Amino acid sequence: MIARIWSGESSLWRLLLPLSWLYGLVSGAIRLSYKLGLKRAWRAPVPVVVVGNLTAGGNGKTPVVIWLVEKLQQRGVRVGVVSRGYGGKAAAYPLLLTPETTTAEAGDEPVLIYQRTGAPVAVAPERAAAVKAILAAHNVQIIITDDGLQHYRLARDIEIVVIDGVRRFGNGWWLPAGPMRERASRLKTVDAAIVNGGVARAGEIPMQLAPGLAVNLRTGARCDVAQLSNIVAMAGIGHPPRFFATLEACGAHPQKCVPLADHQTLAPADVQALVGEGQTLVMTEKDAVKCRAFAEDNWWFLPVDARLSGEQPDKLLEHITSLVR
């Protein structure tokens, strides 16, 4: 229902307009207070790059963060990553991730980024505290914040917005009548706009999510996902239909698709109940970091990597690396 409201297919969004105006008024006032200097943002001693969204829901932000970390690492830059840690609850913050840190403590996206890149990752509701924790423990040259475009308490040097190229900005209204955290005009002030799927507009960087080989959660074995049979697909991400469409495009045709809430806690019994005899469970990599500890032999995940097109990605990377002392 919420997707139909935000896309404009349902007229129920009109009933939510008073709340949206209130949201827009409050969020605009917060940003203006920092812009006018009425509130002070904390500035880190190293450059900060924010990768975020203008809309609620999954846009492909985490693959972009991983892409950016890996590209900077390839250029010899020491990178740290901070996050709010949605879906996790630590005993104390800030929490600096270790190989033993669980998704219940840190959230699924920070654990995924940590496992994929090996970069230092810290989570905290207050991003500045997470940055300070990384700087105290690691000699990093730059910080990337996973989400946090609207977290103005942390000063930033570069702002990158990730846009779903198919859904774009829906009906264009602020939450909850629409998907917008900020107005689309905010794009005029960011350094780069990356468009995941669909058709990028002038000045935007086109991106596609490229699937790799399916990986078995227990053994690490790899195979073409189309070779798996009797698939049950599970996706606990911001926009599950994107994952199901990716499986179809790979030639894997699930018998059943199970959409879950983003950052949803996954109990072993609940996941096991999804798969019948002779069936194979295929999930996102973000779900896999939550399920690996209790995975069955017939559980697989499909990793995806961000593929950015054109000359703009290199120019963006050059701009970012030029900030590193």
From Swiss-Prot:
Kinase recorded as keyword:
yes
Reactions this protein catalyses? a lipid A disaccharide + ATP = a lipid IVA + ADP + H(+)
Record-level GO cellular component terms: plasma membrane
Q: Which InterPro entries match?
A: LpxK, P-loop_NTPase
* EC numbers on record: 2.7.1.130
Q: Does the keyword Nucleotide-binding apply?
A: yes
What Pfam family does this protein match (any one)?
Answer: LpxK
Q: Where does ATP bind?
A: T55, A56, G57, G58, N59, G60, K61, T62
Molecular function (GO) terms for this protein are: ATP binding; tetraacyldisaccharide 4'-kinase activity
Q: In which pathway does it act?
A: Glycolipid biosynthesis; lipid IV(A) biosynthesis; lipid IV(A) from (3R)-3-hydroxytetradecanoyl-[acyl-carrier-protein] and UDP-N-acetyl-alpha-D-glucosamine: step 6/6
What are the alphabetically sorted keywords of the record?
ATP-binding, Kinase, Lipid A biosynthesis, Lipid biosynthesis, Lipid metabolism, Nucleotide-binding, Transferase
Enzyme class, spelled out: transferase
Question: What processes does the entry annotate via GO biological process terms?
Answer: lipid A biosynthetic process; lipopolysaccharide core region biosynthetic process
- Which PANTHER family does the record cross-reference, listed alphabetically? TETRAACYLDISACCHARIDE 4'-KINASE, TETRAACYLDISACCHARIDE 4'-KINASE, MITOCHONDRIAL-RELATED
According to its UniProt entry, what is the function of this protein? Transfers the gamma-phosphate of ATP to the 4'-position of a tetraacyldisaccharide 1-phosphate intermediate (termed DS-1-P) to form tetraacyldisaccharide 1,4'-bis-phosphate (lipid IVA).
- Name the family the entry cites: Belongs to the LpxK family.
Name used for this protein in its record: Tetraacyldisaccharide 4'-kinase
Source organism of the structure: Salmonella paratyphi A (strain AKU_12601)
